[in-house]
Swiss-Prot record:
Protein's organism: Trichodesmium erythraeum (strain IMS101)
Listed GO CC annotations: cytosol
Protein name: Transcription antitermination protein NusB
Gene Ontology BP terms: DNA-templated transcription termination; transcription antitermination
Function text: Involved in transcription antitermination. Required for transcription of ribosomal RNA (rRNA) genes. Binds specifically to the boxA antiterminator sequence of the ribosomal RNA (rrn) operons.
Keyword Kinase attributed: no
Gene behind the chain: nusB
Family per similarity comment: Belongs to the NusB family.
Swiss-Prot/TrEMBL keywords: RNA-binding, Transcription, Transcription antitermination, Transcription regulation
Superkingdom in the source lineage: Bacteria
One Gene Ontology molecular-function label: RNA binding
Keyword Transit peptide applies: no
Length: 207
């Protein structure tokens, strides 16, 4: 799926948030800019790591295929090795599919529009964290936000800040948060994040 500048900015802001202190505090613009630059470097490293891992998996798959022809004396062993080789190949292809998106994303991070919006998101989240976290705590059922994985909490904070302080349409903010969760959160994290933000949506509409 083709990334928009704002989708890229949100991802950049998410990576940058992970490098900010857990407690909110006053941060100068220069400090935030340095955090954004560090997030860009993280993306570059991620792209390199994905490709290196995919290459290693393809090599292991190739070795399995070769061994299935040379080292096995029965059909069942050969079948197992062949299956493992196919599985490694499929995993590598999936990784490469992810890596293919990263060059475009890295190119987008150089755009002023992308970095400016990432900075705006960071500024709003950091400057209004108490209010954002209060609303999130009220919207999470039988759980404390301090116990959430940091990545999930930061995705939620971005969406709430966009809805409350940047003026992004609520459905758009929720949809974008779900996409971030599918990429960065645990297996079912996106479902949890979607549910919490739906409740946030209802509370904001009442305010």
């Amino acid at each position: 799926m083709k990334k928009t500048p704002r989708s890229t900015a949100r991802e950049l802001a998410l990576l940058a948030l992970s490098q900010l202190p857990k407690k909110s505090g006053s941060l100068e613009k220069k400090q935030l800019q340095e955090v954004v630059l560090a997030a860009v470097r993280t993306l570059r490293i991620e792209a390199q790591d994905i490709l290196e891992t995919a290459a290693a998996e393809l090599q292991r798959g190739s070795d399995r295929l070769l061994n299935s022809q040379i080292d096995t004396t029965d059909i069942e062993s050969a079948r197992v090795m062949l299956y493992e080789a196919i599985e490694l190949g499929q995993t590598a292809i999936n990784r490469i599919g992810t890596a293919v998106e990263l060059p475009e994303m890295l190119q987008l991070t150089n755009q002023l529009e992308v970095r400016s919006y990432a900075m705006e998101v960071l500024t709003k989240v950091n400057g209004n964290r108490k209010e954002v976290d209060k609303l999130l705590q009220e919207s999470i059922v039988d759980w404390q936000i301090e116990r959430l994985p940091r990545i999930d909490l930061d995705i939620l904070r971005i969406a709430v800040a966009e809805m409350m302080f940047i003026g992004i349409q609520k459905q758009v903010a929720i949809s974008e948060a779900v996409e971030l969760a599918k990429r960065y959160s645990g297996e079912d994290g996106y479902k949890f994040i979607n549910g919490v933000l739906r409740r946030v949506f209802d509370k904001i509409n009442v305010i």
